[in-house]
């Protein structure tokens, strides 16, 4: 059974992923198509907050991820890896109540489920470095 927060993260990931192929459509509208009556009120609110936060901070998030890609550009990554990294980087930097380990573990699970056999390990390496150098100090105490 998926926890409400895990389902929420999956909804955000799916919206980000679909937006890659539906660029002319609004990201928030894509999310609304994914959120149905099986999501509780808090999960919907959290998903909407994540999407708004990712949209508002996307250039900074992408720039930060790009700094840790060795011999790769963000555009060369698979859509799965790119959007898992965006989701998790947002959560690491802006969602103060979520422990770093939880964010990274959840991102690895999504990457393994939807990506290639190497996606989990790849995402783990990038996020670990981002967390160590950029996560707010109080997150290390959670």
From Swiss-Prot:
Which terms under GO biological process does the entry name? DNA-templated transcription termination; transcription antitermination
* The keyword Transcription regulation appears for this protein: yes
Q: What Gene Ontology molecular-function terms does this entry list?
A: RNA binding
| Keywords, in A-Z order | RNA-binding, Transcription, Transcription antitermination, Transcription regulation
Stored InterPro entries:
NusB-like_sf, NusB_fam, NusB_RsmB_TIM44
Cellular component terms per the entry's GO annotation: cytosol
Matching entries from HAMAP family are given as: NusB
Q: Which NCBIfam families match?
A: nusB
Known function: Involved in transcription antitermination. Required for transcription of ribosomal RNA (rRNA) genes. Binds specifically to the boxA antiterminator sequence of the ribosomal RNA (rrn) operons.
Protein name as it appears in the record: Transcription antitermination protein NusB
Which organism was this protein described from?
Answer: Thermotoga sp. (strain RQ2)
């Amino acid at each position: 059974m998926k926890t409400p927060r895990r389902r929420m993260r999956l909804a955000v990931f799916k919206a980000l992923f679909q937006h890659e192929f539906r660029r002319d459509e609004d990201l928030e509208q894509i999310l609304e198509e994914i959120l149905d009556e099986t999501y509780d009120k808090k999960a919907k609110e959290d998903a909407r907050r994540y999407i708004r936060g990712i949209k508002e901070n996307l250039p900074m998030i992408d720039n930060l991820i790009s700094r840790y890609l060795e011999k790769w550009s963000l555009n060369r990554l698979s859509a799965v890896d790119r959007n898992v990294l965006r989701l998790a980087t947002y959560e690491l930097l802006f969602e103060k109540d979520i422990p770093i380990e939880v964010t990274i573990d959840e991102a690895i699970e999504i990457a393994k489920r939807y990506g290639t056999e190497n996606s989990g390990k790849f995402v783990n390496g990038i996020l670990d470095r981002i967390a160590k150098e950029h996560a707010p100090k109080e997150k290390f105490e959670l």
